[in-house]
């Protein structure tokens, strides 16, 4: 049993289907979107869902689950015209740990301009053997009808990727 686990870990294979939702929120709007996504996934029957606030949970706990489960969703806001620094730090940790063989989804939050989504897309394009699930999108400040529909579609795509 232990040897089998070691082989899975050494090859960075997925241990079990599941979704990590990691988010940074400055005023609560991105946190609300992350929570709503987790709810939608749970209602769709997804059993393994972990919701992590990157501002309050040590990355070591999150990275462990990133390698345990099949899907990672990152939601983060713009800050000073780029990706929030905590999200940037998390992406750096993923790079250091050789993020691979996983599905990922991206959601940015912005009030005006900014490079949060392009920054995330550029970073994930460097990872090998990863697959984008759903269409990346930007929430303009808070969820509205159009971005709630985008969140619905993302949840459906994530559920499909787990089958």
Where are these regions (language model features)?
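Glycine-rich phosphate/diphosphate-binding loop of Rossmann-like nucleotide-binding domains
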Residues: 28-31
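Cytosolic transmitter module of two-component histidine kinases
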Residues: 18-26
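Active-site loop segments of alpha/beta catalytic cores
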Residues: 58
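FMN-binding flavodoxin-like domain, especially the glycine-rich phosphate-binding loop
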Residues: 1, 5-18, 36-54, 62-163
């Amino acid at each position: 049993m232990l040897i089998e686990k070691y082989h899975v870990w050494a090859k960075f294979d997925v241990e079990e289907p599941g979704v990590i939702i990691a988010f940074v929120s400055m005023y609560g709007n991105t946190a609300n979107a992350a929570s709503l996504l987790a709810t939608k996934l749970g209602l769709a029957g997804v059993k393994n869902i972990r919701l992590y606030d990157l501002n309050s949970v040590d990355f070591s706990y999150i990275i462990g689950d990133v390698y345990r489960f099949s899907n990672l969703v990152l939601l983060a806001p713009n800050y000073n015209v780029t990706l929030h620094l905590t999200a940037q730090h998390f992406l750096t940790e993923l790079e250091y740990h050789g993020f691979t063989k996983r599905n990922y989804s991206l959601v940015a939050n912005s009030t005006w301009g900014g490079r949060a989504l392009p920054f995330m897309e550029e970073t994930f394009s460097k990872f090998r053997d990863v697959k984008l699930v759903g269409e990346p999108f930007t929430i303009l400040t808070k969820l509205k009808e159009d971005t709630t529909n985008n969140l619905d579609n993302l949840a459906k795509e994530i559920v499909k990727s787990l089958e």
